[in-house]
Amino acid sequence: KIEKVPVNHRHLNREQFEKLLNARLPTYRLCHTRDLFVFSVFTGIGRADLANLTEDNIITKEDGSKWIHIARQKTKAECHIKLLDIPLCIIEKYKGEGKDGRLFYVPQTCNLCRSLKIIAEQCNLGCHLTFYQARHSFATLICLSNGVPIETISKMMGHYSIRTTQIYAEITNHKVSRDLETLSENTKGKYALPDDGMPSRVFKCGNYSGWKKKCESSDRTKMK
């Protein structure tokens, strides 16, 4: 049996993503491509599903929130994704530009890749941009780093197995640090070390071996 080697997928870190968001790009084509990429980062939707997204896929809930309901082209899995402020702004920005009821005009993959390469260079990101990377960034940067459970991420990304989601969602050092801060707050004052009679000077003076011999001698005396 051949052992599977885990794949280390790249996702944008917070600094890279902020550079991308705030960049003033020189042409409409680059701005449009950047916005499609950002939409993917905030929704986890890949290029193929983005191209097929229509107004009928946008559902308004009773509380007024808007959601994307789609079946992924690749797996046919149902995905329900809440639209946050930035993707809602992007939809409004490009309203009416898509054909046949589609939300967006999405260029061919080769043209997108060419534009993404230029954007990455102009923003000094130090990495290549792809829509696979956008999905990884959705799982890690947008969801997991902000406390969204991996089961929920898996459902939104249209995965049938959480193991697949684990490939996309990577635990960052920032996430670990924040989780441990929460753990520290939640356990503060809940536990106490009992007084076992061991003098603290034993450890301060490094005289543990001598203290241990005293205890053993005392135990032997009690047994006699």
Predicted regions and their residues:
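Short basic/aromatic active-site micro-motif
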Residues: 32-34, 107-110, 126-146, 159
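C-terminal secondary-structure termini that scaffold catalytic or DNA-interacting sites
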Residues: 183-224
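Short, polar N-cap/turn motifs at the start of nucleic acid-interacting alpha helices
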Residues: 57-64, 126-127, 147-167, 174, ...
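C-terminal catalytic core of tyrosine-transesterase DNA break-rejoin enzymes
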Residues: 38, 42, 48-49, 118, ...
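C-terminal catalytic core of Y-nucleophile DNA break-rejoin enzymes
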Residues: 6, 73-92, 98-118
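Basic, Lys/Arg- and aromatic-enriched nucleic-acid-binding interface segment
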Residues: 1-47, 97
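Short, charged phosphate-coordinating catalytic segments
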Residues: 15-16, 40-64, 151
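Catalytic-site neighborhood detector that most strongly recognizes the C-terminal catalytic loop/helix
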Residues: 3, 11, 72-76, 109, ...
